[in-house]
């Protein structure tokens, strides 16, 4: 579909992917030309454990880029019949685990693709960043927030981490050019 035509390198799961159940979600994900990453859900149904990966490592212009995904707690957000036995893991602990793992794999850049929302009851992007270290950028969604410019949250080391959110429903499409010194 359209997302394949847009050339995504990776995507994550949002709560609305569950609207028509796990079997439908698996069918949709199988049709994609890019990986779906989500590190804080564990699946046991419809081959989703083989389709959804916690992270992916991309190679671009000589850089090794680790991308992991985070998604919101489903209980109270999605009808339980639509998410079945999906297990939700704490996004803060999971983000730290993923950043550590990707740094050990010598990634030059670690990106979190998040559907947690900006400030969402203690488990949004801001809170995850402020309680972890090792991620370089968060590309967020869920709260339908539109940032005209990047926002920053300090990580555990006091380093400002950029966060971008582009609203909802594809009204805005973000484009970001990163420039940094490879050490």
Segments from the language model and where they lie:
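Acidic, metal/ion-coordinating pockets
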Residues: 1-183
């Amino acid at each position: 579909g359209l997302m394949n035509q847009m050339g995504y390198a990776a995507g994550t799961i949002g709560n609305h992917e569950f609207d028509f159940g796990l079997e439908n979600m698996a069918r949709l994900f199988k049709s994609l030309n890019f990986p779906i990453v989500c590190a804080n859900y564990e699946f046991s149904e419809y081959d989703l454990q083989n389709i959804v990966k916690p992270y992916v490592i991309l190679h671009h212009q000589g850089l090794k880029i680790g991308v992991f995904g985070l998604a919101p707690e489903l209980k109270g957000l999605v009808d339980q019949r639509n998410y079945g036995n999906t297990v939700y893991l704490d996004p803060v602990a999971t983000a730290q685990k993923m950043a550590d793992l990707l740094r050990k794999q010598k990634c030059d850049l670690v990106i979190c693709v998040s559907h947690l929302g900006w400030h969402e009851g203690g488990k949004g992007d801001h809170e995850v960043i402020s309680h972890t270290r090792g991620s370089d950028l968060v590309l967020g969604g869920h709260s339908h927030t539109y940032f005209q410019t990047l926002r920053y949250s300090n990580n555990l080391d006091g380093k400002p981490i950029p966060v971008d959110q582009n609203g909802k429903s594809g009204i805005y499409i973000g484009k970001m050019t990163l420039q940094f010194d490879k050490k």
